[in-house]
Amino acid sequence: MWNPILLDTSSFSFQKHVSGVFLQVRNATKRAAGSRTSMKDSAGRRLGPKKYEGQDVSTGEIIMRQRGTKFYPGENVGIGKDHSIFALEPGVVRYYLDPFHPKRKFIGVALRRDLKLPSPHFEPTVRRFGRFELTNKRAAYKEENSISRKDYLAKPNILKQLEVRESKRKELQDKLSKVLRDELKLDIKDIELATSYLIRVRASLKNGYPIEDARFNSRYYLKEEERLKARRESWTNEKLSESLSKIDECSDLLNSSTSFNNKLELHQYISEQEKQALKAKLLEDLEKSQHLETKKDKNYIKALFKDACNFLTLSEEVHLRRKYLKSVFPETDSTVETKSGKKSIVSRRFDYTKNKVEVIARSRRAFLSKL
């Protein structure tokens, strides 16, 4: 095919004998020119079905050769440039009609011999995800124990992290058992069950659960683990019920005698009424000593916050610390100096109204760290 390309002659001038440029466009499907004398008919293309209904096919096998789409591709088959239909999955050939396309005839491949096409419209699609059944026991065992290269390279790091996590969990378990015995002096028969319950509660609190949900989830987890163990080891109903009652007794004792503060540290149980009373007393003491002028005042307010983590939430404690222990105090007559001295702390600030840089001298009492 020849396409003339018209050039813009307004931008530059041509020579006298140049009239235009022609470029040939060649396409992959363009038939070559034939001879006038060769009017012979070519051999047949062997069209028609190559696999019939119910025959087994492998991936890539041609099922139908045709000119045009006499048959349309159905499930698990593809169609080529010459409209040949071929299998995309190993299975059984099915010729069928689709009620959603009543004027078309389809060819598909069923993945199993008991499956019929078309598949039910609202049912899940049957897929292999590139897998096939291994009948050889040795090959099946090898496949079960094989891992990808990416997982193989990451395996040492994963095992190391698991060891670190297990060691941290063991340290936390020892720490909690020491607190239960030495500080709280609780008479607990199964200390391992108690520490495992407290670790689950602490993890739930760390993930943002309320204390009631954390306790419920921890108790439910331990009970479910015990039921699964009983099923594996074929326990009797009496033994299982006795084990579950131990979990209930231990969790009830811990819920009524222990609690976690906002730093996730175990301490003596404090009721909600006691927490509100301690919070009100703390606010009253903080209001009395609002003005920080000396190091003694700073240490006094810090001492008030010493046990605040036991009855305040983390957000409440942070809010109160930012309010009463400000790192930089507001600019007042007592903290702003008219002249800068040797002990003054000078800062420069741009004044947009006056359009100039102001030099502000402040005393050391204006900064909490300098008291």
Curated annotation (Swiss-Prot):
Q: Name one GO cellular component term.
A: mitochondrion
Question: Which UniProt keywords are listed?
Answer: Mitochondrion, Ribonucleoprotein, Ribosomal protein, Transit peptide
Matching entries from Pfam families are given as: Ribosomal_L27 (PF01016), Ribosomal_L27_C (PF18471)
Superkingdom field? Eukaryota
Q: Where is the transit peptide?
A: 1-27
Q: Which GO terms describe its biological process?
A: mitochondrial cytochrome c oxidase assembly; mitochondrial translation
Main location group: mitochondrion
Instruction: Output one GO MF annotation.
Output: structural constituent of ribosome
**Listed InterPro entries:** Ribosomal_bL27, Ribosomal_bL27_CS, Ribosomal_bL27m_C
Q: Which SUPFAM superfamilies match?
A: Ribosomal L27 protein-like
Cellular compartments annotated: Mitochondrion
Q: Does the keyword Transit peptide apply?
A: yes
Which PANTHER family does the entry mention? LARGE RIBOSOMAL SUBUNIT PROTEIN BL27M (PTHR15893:SF0), RIBOSOMAL PROTEIN L27 (PTHR15893)
Anything else known:
Present with 2300 molecules/cell in log phase SD medium.
Give the family from UniProt.
Belongs to the bacterial ribosomal protein bL27 family.
**What does the UniProt function comment say about this protein?**
Component of the mitochondrial ribosome (mitoribosome), a dedicated translation machinery responsible for the synthesis of mitochondrial genome-encoded proteins, including at least some of the essential transmembrane subunits of the mitochondrial respiratory chain. The mitoribosomes are attached to the mitochondrial inner membrane and translation products are cotranslationally integrated into the membrane.
Q: How does it assemble?
A: Component of the mitochondrial large ribosomal subunit (mt-LSU). Mature yeast 74S mitochondrial ribosomes consist of a small (37S) and a large (54S) subunit. The 37S small subunit contains a 15S ribosomal RNA (15S mt-rRNA) and 34 different proteins. The 54S large subunit contains a 21S rRNA (21S mt-rRNA) and 46 different proteins.
| Name under which the protein is recorded | Large ribosomal subunit protein bL27m
Organism field: Saccharomyces cerevisiae (strain ATCC 204508 / S288c) (Baker's yeast)
